[in-house]
Structures are given as structure tokens and as C-alpha cells.
């Protein structure tokens, strides 16, 4: 059953974001999504300094970055969050998720950097992953175009961005085994209603296939735009680029502290739970949290929904608690 405030959020969303949006062209989807995001984005919270910059990737393209830095620095809350936005790898921008990134910075006192990675279908797999990995490596090496970013680093993201945070962490772990820069310096990862596998996990894949705001058909449409036709008949053996589907990994050990959040009415709900179970089975530290009565993309209802306010508080508490732990 939907929380009452979430039902109102869904009703308002339906007036802005047509149910068939995932079937439209990427350009049409982005125009609709940008209008939708703007309708739910409040003014910036007080006490933040915002700075835009760009990072030049190894292939020569620019990756947009936006830093939210609390004006009143608190040495007891020193750290930087790299945030990877959601949007099915197809939509989303620095602006679209400001309701999340600005509030995370304001409510934790941490620096938060939003990452404007390349989008599909113009840039298919593994472009988004590669951009986020490059930015993370640059952050760890002190090469981002911002002054005095506090360590340590945390990774976070929602939906597709949750996939990217998990895949970057796995890639860094595996790099560390061959003598290159690894996970040292990354204290934790927070995944909010993430997409972590080629197929959403059961039972939500079946019970929530027609959930509000994200259906199973939507998941498959986004999957095809980013990963291509690898799961179509006749293409089942096409290779999946390493790390881009975290639930397909061979290993779940060696990861930093992990929070994975699922929401009740979402075909992706059980991806978070299964990821946590596999990390725990491998001896790692991970916790799951379930948002009852909530839907995919509900963070935009932060101002009205008690359940979303609890979700947001859970993420903030995890980030701060993780930073307080000894190395």
C-alpha cells in the first residue's frame, strides 16, 4: 500500500511525466525529465557554497562536476561524497538531482560532488561507469578542479547511479589487487533503489512489475539503451563489460561499508537486499533498509513524505557514522 503522501506525489508526477516516457526518443525523455525534476526542485538550502567545474577525461571529453560545500566547516564532519545521479543511464544531469545533492550536503555538513557522466544511447556501456571511475580516481589522487576537498571519500547514487557507485567500488577493489590504485580512501558506499543486475531480483520483479513511476518494461527499455541487445534472442552470449552489473560479480568481498536501500513498490526493490546478502555472506559489512509504502524515485517527495524523510535520514546517518569509524 502506498503511503498517503507518496500517493499524492505519484498523482502529481503523472501530470508531468507521462507513463509512456521510456518508449520515446532519448531527447524527448530528457526534455520531459528535466521539466519534471525542475517542478520538484526547491531553492538551495542556506549555508552552501556551490561551484561548477569540469574534469577532462583520458579520452578527451569533459565531465561536468558540481560541488556543494558547507560554508561553516565542521572538523567533526570532514569528508567528501561523490554522487552519481539516477535516470536509467539515459536522463539526468547536475540540475536534475539537486534536490538530493544539495540536501545531503546541508544535512550532513559534508562536501558533495555531483558527477555529470555520459548518457546512453549516445554513449553505451561502459561509458557511464568509466566516467565515474575516472572521477573517483582523480578525487582519490587530489586531481579534481576544486580546492581542499576533505578526505575520506564516500560514493553514493540512486537507481542507475547506485549501479555506478557499486560498480566503481568493485572496479577499485580489483584494481588494488594488481598493484594499481584501489579502494584505500573510499570509506563507504550508499545505494538508493539501485539497479544492480540484468534482471531485477525476485520476488519484486514479478510482484512490482507494474509499480507506479517505474515498471519492469521501463527497466528493460533503459537496459537496452545502455547495454544494448545482449539479452535479446540470439544475443544471449554477448559479453557484459566487467563490473557494470554488480550482482553478476564473482566476488563480493573486499568492499567498503555498504548501505543499500530498496523501496516497497519498485521492480528493483530486491536488488538492494540481494546485494547486501551477498556482501554479508562474503564476510563484508553491509546493511539493507526497506522503505515501506515508497516508490522508485521517491526522494523528490522529501518535503512532504514521512517515509522519504526517514530514507533521507538513513542515508545521512550512514554517511556520518561511516566517517566516524576508525580506519
Where are these regions (language model features)?
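Gly/Ala-rich beta-loop-alpha elbow adjacent to hydrolase catalytic centers
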Residues: 157, 161, 165
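Catalytic nucleophile-loop/oxyanion-hole region of alpha/beta-hydrolase
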Residues: 93-94, 100, 113-152, 302-308
Amino acid at each position: 500500500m502506498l503511503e498517503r503522501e507518496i500517493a499524492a506525489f505519484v498523482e502529481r508526477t503523472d501530470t508531468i511525466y507521462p507513463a509512456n516516457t521510456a518508449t520515446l526518443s532519448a531527447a524527448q525523455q530528457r526534455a520531459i525529465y528535466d521539466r519534471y525534476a525542475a517542478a520538484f526542485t526547491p531553492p538551495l538550502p542556506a549555508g552552501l557554497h556551490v561551484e561548477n567545474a569540469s574534469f577532462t577525461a583520458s579520452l578527451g571529453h569533459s565531465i561536468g562536476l558540481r560541488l556543494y560545500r558547507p560554508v561553516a566547516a565542521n572538523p567533526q564532519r570532514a569528508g567528501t561524497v561523490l554522487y552519481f545521479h539516477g535516470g536509467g543511464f539515459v536522463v539526468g544531469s547536475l540540475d536534475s538531482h539537486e534536490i538530493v545533492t544539495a540536501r545531503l550536503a546541508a544535512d550532513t555538513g559534508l562536501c558533495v560532488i555531483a558527477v555529470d557522466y555520459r548518457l546512453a544511447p549516445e554513449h553505451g556501456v561502459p561509458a557511464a561507469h568509466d566516467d565515474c571511475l575516472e572521477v573517483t580516481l582523480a578525487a582519490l589522487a587530489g586531481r579534481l578542479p576544486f580546492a581542499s576537498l576533505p578526505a575520506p571519500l564516500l560514493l553514493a547514487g540512486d537507481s542507475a547511479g547506485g549501479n555506478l557507485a557499486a560498480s566503481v567500488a568493485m572496479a577499485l577493489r580489483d584494481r588494488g589487487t594488481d598493484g594499481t590504485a584501489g579502494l584505500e580512501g573510499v570509506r563507504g558506499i550508499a545505494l538508493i533503489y539501485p539497479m544492480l543486475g540484468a534482471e531485477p531480483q525476485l520476488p519484486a520483479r514479478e510482484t512490482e512489475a507494474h509499480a507506479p513511476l517505474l515498471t519492469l518494461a521501463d527497466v528493460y527499455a533503459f537496459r537496452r539503451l545502455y547495454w544494448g541487445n545482449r539479452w535479446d534472442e540470439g544475443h544471449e552470449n554477448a559479453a557484459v563489460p566487467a563490473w557494470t552489473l554488480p550482482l553478476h560479480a564473482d566476488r563480493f568481498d573486499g568492499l567498503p561499508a555498504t548501505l543499500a536501500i530498496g523501496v516497497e513498490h519498485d521492480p528493483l526493490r530486491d536488488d538492494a537486499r540481494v546485494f547486501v546478502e551477498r556482501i554479508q555472506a562474503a564476510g563484508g559489512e553491509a546493511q539493507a533498509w526497506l522503505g515501506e509504502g515508497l516508490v522508485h524515485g521517491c526522494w523528490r517527495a522529501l518535503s512532504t513524505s514521512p517515509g522519504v524523510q526517514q530514507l533521507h535520514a538513513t542515508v545521512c546517518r550512514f554517511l556520518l557514522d561511516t566517517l566516524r569509524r576508525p580506519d
